[in-house]
Amino acid sequence: MSTVPVVQGAGSSNSAQDISTSSVPLTLQGRISNLLSSTAFKVGLVVMGLLLVMATIFLVSAASFVNPIYLAIPAIVGCVNICVGILSMEGYCSPERWSLCKKVLKASEDIIDDGQINNSNKVFTDERLNAIGGVVESLSRRNSLVDQTQ
């Protein structure tokens, strides 16, 4: 790590007074990008999603008198968290990962809405997931290009 003295021409024995030229301070966007691309954040998304799904299943079974659609919202958010974590785990999304996430989202909605897997989806329909698939594919291509340049 190279340093530049604070006062030009005067060397310093105290490295705290020197300004580092090798490390550029990160902007807010750079720090957020580093956080979002960290493995800990992605694993945290998956864990948070699992916790939301489990909490919703527990609440639906405990509170049968409440409208279950309000309790399904955390589960849907949890499933989306799980899928985002899975899709972004290595920086790109393969077609196999995307098909796995589509199956998870569709099955979780089926189980949450009426307890049976009968393809009665209203939120995660094939049309909506296919539309999202185009966005996922383009983001995946962009992320793989960024990874190749680094």
UniProtKB/Swiss-Prot annotation:
Keywords: Membrane, Transmembrane, Transmembrane helix. InterPro entries: CRPA (IPR008436). It holds the Pfam family CRPA. GO terms for cellular component: outer membrane. It comes from the Bacteria. It is found in: Membrane. It is a multi-pass membrane protein. Residues 1-20 are annotated as: Disordered. The chain crosses the membrane at residues 43-63, 69-89. This is Sulfur-rich protein, serovars L1/L3. It comes from Chlamydia trachomatis. The gene is srp.
